Amino acid sequence: MDFAEFQIDWDRERRTGVPEAIFSQGKTAAQIGAIVAAAADRRLLLTRLSAVAHETLAPEVRDALDYDPLSATAVLGGGIPLAASGIGIVAAGTSDLPVAREAARTLAFAGHRTEIIADVGVAGLWRLTARIDTLRQFRILIAVAGMEGALFSVLAGLVEAPVVAVPTSVGYGVAEGGRAALHSALASCAPGLVVVNIDNGFGAAAAALKMLRAGRERP
């Protein structure tokens, strides 16, 4: 393969605070294999690598990757020790866990331990309020929800920490593949809510990393 087809941005984490990641969707098995080979002894995060695409990779490429089918992420180069981050991830429903896991795996790749609090959507509000003392201990919260996305405003109205909203494509009918949840997040009456694109767990993790880094490095 002509290596001009891709250029890995190894300097990205130093420059921006967010590690380089390979968006695997749309790439061929040969392209992914060449990227993994080019990474050699370095660490690399791959996102949106479906189980079907993972199975098409050459055996030696698959063997080199720590693959998580739920989040469709893979890590080359193994894990690193995780430090407490103060970042919590709140998933409205079990069906939102793939996106929540993408955020968690991205943060783990960057060396940050997170906690996922799952199935606390507002259809059973007691599930959320029962965990409110725990939620208020986090420095940053990532909220993941589909359907109507009501979790975003409710959570952001209960905690001091910044909340990053991730609408998911979970739902049907007028949920419109996550658009209803996205519009709900954007129209939220809870001030300070940060919103990323539909199903963008990686983007939410990137926002959290920047917040964390800014809080540590600046007075």
Could you describe each region identified by the protein language model?
Residues 91, 135-136, 140, 170, ...:
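C-terminal binding/interaction regions
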Residues 22, 45, 86-92, 141-143, ...:
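Short glycine-rich or small-residue beta-strand-to-loop segments that form or flank ligand, phosphate
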Residues 32, 96-101, 125, 145-155, ...:
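Short glycine/serine/threonine-rich phosphate/pyrophosphate-binding segments
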Residues 1-66:
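Long amphipathic alpha-helical segments
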Residues 84-126:
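Glycine-rich phosphate/diphosphate-binding loop of Rossmann-like nucleotide-binding domains
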Residues 130-168:
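Glycine-rich phosphate-binding loop
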Residues 71-73, 113-134, 179-180, 196-199:
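Glycine-rich oxoanion-binding loops at beta->alpha junctions
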